[in-house]
UniProtKB/Swiss-Prot annotation:
It is an enzyme of class 5 (isomerase). Catalyzes the reversible isomerization of glucose-6-phosphate to fructose-6-phosphate. Its main location: cytoplasm. The gene is pgi. The active site is at E355 (proton donor), H386, K514. This is Glucose-6-phosphate isomerase. It comes from Aeromonas salmonicida (strain A449). GO terms for molecular function: carbohydrate derivative binding; glucose-6-phosphate isomerase activity; monosaccharide binding. GO terms for biological process: gluconeogenesis; glucose 6-phosphate metabolic process; glycolytic process.
Amino acid sequence: MKNINPTQTQAWQALEAHFAANKETRLKDLFAQDPKRFDKFSLTFGGDILVDYSKNLITEETLKLLVDLAKETDLRSAIDAMFNGEKINMTEGRSVLHVALRNRSDRPIECDGKDVMPEVNAVLAKMKGFCEKIISGEWKGYTGKAIQHVVNIGIGGSDLGPVMITEALRPYKNHLQMHFVSNVDGTHIAETLKEIDAETTLFLVASKTFTTQETMTNALTARDWFIKIAGDKAHVAKHFAALSTNGKAVAEFGIDTDNMFEFWDWVGGRYSSWSAIGMPIALSVGFDNFEALLQGAFEMDMHFATASYEQNVPVLLALIGLWYNNFHGAESEAILPYDQYMHRFPAYFQQGNMESNGKYVDRNGNPVDHQTGPIIWGEPGTNGQHAFYQLIHQGTKLIPCDFLAPAISHNPIGDHHPKLLANFFAQTEALAFGKSKEQVEAEFLAAGKTLEQVEDLVPFKVFEGNRPTNSILFKSLTPKTLGALIAMYEHKIFVQGAIWNIFSFDQWGVELGKQLANKILPELNTAEAVTSHDCSTNGLINTWKAWKA
């Protein structure tokens, strides 16, 4: 990867001039000028995902300049470097090869001169065998009963991805009851233990190092609870499995290392659902559906690696997002899935994007002179319409939005889905074109009101419009489609980080708080007043000590 400051490129300067010259661009005018705008500014991927980006504040010239920026910052070399296993996570000296985890071809993928695919496929085969035993009931617990409950204990990438995907694929779910524990708050594990019984529960402890504080605290609590009921530590081996690389620690915990499923240091946490960390997904929906998830991601990988920038879905989404972030001054993006099964999708990419691109130091080690990662947030529709859409429609902040929806529902009850999609289609139209003062007045007149009666109310019912959106419509939410959608957003994040000249695959920002927490924890176990911090932190700790005494 070349370390190029994007603001110093000719394309960036051209984009600044282009923005200044087109600040008054109106979507209403762009559509009026070009009846074929939808055809020009939409793409279909794989025949079952439509990406309509026509309701954006862009012209063909805008896209040309954005593509020029990608070329001038040498995006191609960054893409090739990732797929070729180069150590593009330079601050940790690691390759970034989540694409290898879903490589469904015979193509070798090398890391440090070694093809990683034999090991990847061996772990997948081991996962498949384990899943089949658990799902079929062949695997028995310590009393001879089959497993009915699976509790995944992890945090961050070891939790958010499996939770989001198992929720999204609930229509494909088997009889196993899935539970997820992540928070070190004892309430999370306590409430989960109330829902299960020891005889029929399998615990998955998901920690690469088997030292993650939150995960191991919860795992030890679960183990102690289990042993107290089972009466014999030896029974742990039948009820606990590890998703880890630390065989010594796994064995010391009491887990049979035959039931340890490894992954590698080139797998980043927020990109790990494709690895052994995806075990709860495979257990929930079956291994065939897990493989379909991988297949969808693989097909998006191949599209991303080979399509021209002008026809490349992740690249176009990244460039359009960059246009708003760096030239329009937008500080956030909303992800709005009109599918209840996808209710954790925004939270998943909140981590995926903000942990990847929330950086203020460039790849040369210097402070950046431009904006980097946006704030990502969102909720499912139509709930969000009754919560925060007011600000998107009539607030003072520009918030580009991605709307996602399936054409076909897994639950075609009455007219629920047509009503849902009517709102999906209506929102992007309303955001783009708004409602003028003249339209508002005409509505009042049609309702029998005089303008004198309503003139004070008219300004409040005007919608400026010109609020940009992408519409991502897919035929149905299948494992394969979900895999493609996840990979699409992953690559969007990568493209933006590459152009911004930052490292997207480390996360040093999570470390300082953990270090200070490790320093503070022993102080909480003494009765003495604390004086070792600033006056605010001292005051908070000492108040806590007084209140808990």
